[in-house]
Amino acid sequence: MRLLARHAIRLLGQENSAGEVASLSRGAIRLKATTGYLNLATASVQPLEPEKQVLRKNSPLTDSFGRHHTYLRISLTERCNLRCDYCMPAEGVPLQPKNKLLTTEEILRLARIFVEQGVRKIRLTGGEPTVRRDIVEIVAQMKALPELEQIGITTNGLVLTRLLLPLQRAGLDNLNISLDTLKRDRFEKITRRKGWERVIAGIDLAVQLGYRPKVNCVLMRDFNEDEICDFVEFTRNRPVDVRFIEYMPFSGNKWHTERLISYKDTLQIIRQRWPDFKALPNGPNDTSKAYAVPGFKGQVGFITSMTEHFCGTCNRLRLTADGNIKVCLFGNKEFSLRDAMRDESVSEEQLVDLIGAAVQRKKKQHADAAPRLHHHLHPYSYHHAYHTSRLQLQARNYSQLTHVDGQGKAQMVDVGAKPSTTRLARAEATVQVGEKLTQLIADNQVAKGDVLTVAQIAGIMGAKRTAELIPLCHNISLSSVKVQATLLKTEQSVRLEATVRCSGQTGVEMEALTAVSVAALTVYDMCKAVSHDICITNVRLLSKSGGKRDFQREEPQNGIVTEVE
């Protein structure tokens, strides 16, 4: 039971404490509600019959935004038989010890558990899944799961001519093939291996066997953008779905956005040659925007994870080769089901509870925490991002950001067309000062003077200079700035609250936040001669009104001890 609690604590992440694992009762993990993920707006979902709504709501595979996850991607291996230069060095990469990876029995057990909880589609990925000797057996055993509707595989296609017929007999339903070029020489240069002919032969064999394979192509500027129309032409006589995937422009420590070719740019290139290139209907959980040239046997799709995310309808979970569950491809949080499964004291019911707890931690969208870069990137950096389990980066989502244009360049928002309204914003910050400083502030004995009054004045001045401190922030004519400093003796802290008002075309939340931040820094500056164990915390917006989207946070429950107005 202690191990199960440790698993849950690890899942909660560094920002939460062990105290948030409220209890373990009858094998069920109950997590305390924490501000920040239970107060977010619920994403829209497709209407269901009432009884199905109840089942989905109570399912461990339904997250806090109502998204029910029916699609599981399982990475069978970290190994690959290609050496694509954007994935790994020519000599390969260090692999995890075998005992750290899931065994075949563990993979099949987890697949069964997920299917019993509501997964209806499984895709086997890697690395390269066909390097496993037991790939056919795994497909056959998963296909035998009574409630599983589809099983697919994503592969580089090198050995399809040898394996596809046995895989079809085992029950393989669908097939994705990764191919970034239709030119033999370019293929050998990028993959450092021969085999382009075998991949094309594998695609043609798949068509002959009745499949409609999906061909995944990562578009990169100055690499294969000259082949965009060639890939569309590839669909003329073949019933295949070519899917252009936007390049995730991360390399080493830097974003290289110059290599990104956006969906709209690609669409424009295609329509220059085929003006009647038209959109097709999409399913509710499709990641690809479907298009086709009239009369062609195949179609084209666009996976726009960089410029237009599809988080609102995401129904996918990922299981890594070493047994971690990932609820988001772009997230850095992973949670080991392997460790829990190998602990004999953890029951299957408890394992399901852990899966449910992981799903509940899924965010509304992968860009909601801003485009952050994480330090521990898996060596297989891009092409297998759609079937590699441990890519850890946050996507830049330019189309959703107001202060950058479509190419990621900085721009100031034009508010000229907005109506002029009365705008109001409130923000707060807390400065933990400790017992000694609390008494000195209360007695007005701090050597630099009246801490609360000076902090109040500094906050007002800070609000008025916000446009000089925050890039691209509008210079606003403020009608009122009020900063309140409160000494909380019991908490040994100073609470700062700012209320800012204006009549204008843009809001004043940044002015309110700047006011409390500058006031908090002033408290630190005036008190640092006494102690450096001062902590500025809880800087946050309390409310804003008068704009397109009002906001109201629940009021803090702090007792007022000393007040300066």
From Swiss-Prot:
Pfam family name, one: MoaC
GO biological process: inter-male aggressive behavior; Mo-molybdopterin cofactor biosynthetic process; molybdopterin cofactor biosynthetic process
Cofactor: [4Fe-4S] cluster
Disulfide bonds: none
Classification via PANTHER family: MOLYBDENUM COFACTOR BIOSYNTHESIS PROTEIN 1, MOLYBDOPTERIN COFACTOR SYNTHESIS PROTEIN A
Described function: Isoform Mocs1a and isoform Mocs1b probably form a complex that catalyzes the conversion of 5'-GTP to cyclic pyranopterin monophosphate (cPMP). Mocs1a catalyzes the cyclization of GTP to (8S)-3',8-cyclo-7,8-dihydroguanosine 5'-triphosphate and Mocs1b catalyzes the subsequent conversion of (8S)-3',8-cyclo-7,8-dihydroguanosine 5'-triphosphate to cPMP.
Family that this chain belongs to: In the C-terminal section; belongs to the MoaC family. In the N-terminal section; belongs to the radical SAM superfamily. MoaA family.
Protein name per the record: Molybdenum cofactor biosynthesis protein 1
Organism ancestry: Eukaryota, Metazoa, Ecdysozoa, Arthropoda, Hexapoda
Gene symbol of the encoding locus: Mocs1
